[in-house]
Amino acid sequence: MPSAPDAPAAPDAAASVAPNPPAALPVTVRWLGETPYDACFDAMRAFTDARTPDTDDEIWVVEHPPVYTLGQAGNPAHLLVADSGVPLVKVDRGGQITYHGPGQIVAYLLVDLRRRKLMVRTLVTRIEEAVIETLAAYNLASARKAGAPGIYVESGPHRGAKIAALGLKIRNGCSYHGLSVNVKMDLRPFLAINPCGYAGLETIDMASLGATADWHEVAQTLVRRLIAHLDGATAAAALPQQALEQSND
């Protein structure tokens, strides 16, 4: 009669313990209120140029007075009404022309990609996911569109309308610029441009789709989702409440 097989060895206790996830990297959230675009543009370039390997990443949340911005490869012909009264600022982000104004959340992501071991495409994907999840929190279905950066309404009579824009600049391995989400705003200035270079592209806001949340609530949701996609859900859940409170730093 063959002998019984040896019992399998008990696993090493140390080997059976899942490794701890890497510690979340600090992210400072700054609530800048309503700030002129030029001031933010100059400040984020200065911040990026001055940062060191030890500088914490930051997210700046802001609302701009009316302004058009044209990306570094942008075509000025996409501004259809030259005398609209809204200033045009040429900037160094990717993308074409877009509009910023009251009722829109703008979030600038000042992130050290090398320290986080992120490729640019990965960062863009995580930002897009954060926006999609933010909109879903208000029962708005949205999605990416191949070859057209930003987030678009996924269903209903406004299917295909753009509700969020995205454009980054990478300098010395660090990002600046970021994204915008239309909450409740005057959409007429978008009619004077080809948004992001697409003639006839409809632009929509959350209020027009039936969402009643205010700017501050949506901004807080967005910040949590951005941090969750940078550092994980645990880091987002642990974000202190004061980090989500409005202040002018």
Curated annotation (Swiss-Prot):
NCBIfam families given for it?
Answer: lipB (TIGR00214), PRK14342.1 (NF010922), PRK14343.1 (NF010923)
Q: In which pathway does it act?
A: Protein modification; protein lipoylation via endogenous pathway; protein N(6)-(lipoyl)lysine from octanoyl-[acyl-carrier-protein]: step 1/2
Purpose of the protein: Catalyzes the transfer of endogenously produced octanoic acid from octanoyl-acyl-carrier-protein onto the lipoyl domains of lipoate-dependent enzymes. Lipoyl-ACP can also act as a substrate although octanoyl-ACP is likely to be the physiological substrate.
| Assigned keywords, A-Z | Acyltransferase, Cytoplasm, Transferase
- Active-site residues, Swiss-Prot/TrEMBL: 196 (acyl-thioester intermediate)
Its main subcellular localisation, reduced to a broad class, is cytoplasm
Q: HAMAP family, per this entry?
A: LipB
Q: Which reaction does it catalyse?
A: octanoyl-[ACP] + L-lysyl-[protein] = N(6)-octanoyl-L-lysyl-[protein] + holo-[ACP] + H(+)
Which Pfam families does the UniProt entry name for this protein? LplA-B_cat
Q: Which organism is it from?
A: Burkholderia mallei (strain SAVP1)
What's an example GO cellular component term for this entry? cytoplasm
Per the database record, which ranges form the BPL/LPL catalytic domain? Answer: 53-234
Enumerate the InterPro entries for this protein. aa-tRNA-synth_II/BPL/LPL (IPR045864), BPL_LPL_catalytic (IPR004143), Octanoyltransferase (IPR000544), Octanoyltransferase_CS (IPR020605)
Other comment: In the reaction, the free carboxyl group of octanoic acid is attached via an amide linkage to the epsilon-amino group of a specific lysine residue of lipoyl domains of lipoate-dependent enzymes.
Superkingdom of origin? Bacteria
Residues annotated as binding substrate: 93-100, 165-167, 178-180
Under Gene3D superfamilies, the record lists: Bira Bifunctional Protein, Domain 2
Report the family membership: Belongs to the LipB family.
The molecular function terms in GO held by this entry are: lipoyl(octanoyl) transferase activity
Q: Which GO terms describe its biological process?
A: protein modification process
The enzyme's E.C. designation: 2.3.1.181
UniProt entry tagged with the keyword Acyltransferase: yes
Official protein name in the record:
Octanoyltransferase
Marked site: Lowers pKa of active site Cys: 162
Indicate where this protein resides in the cell.
Answer: Cytoplasm
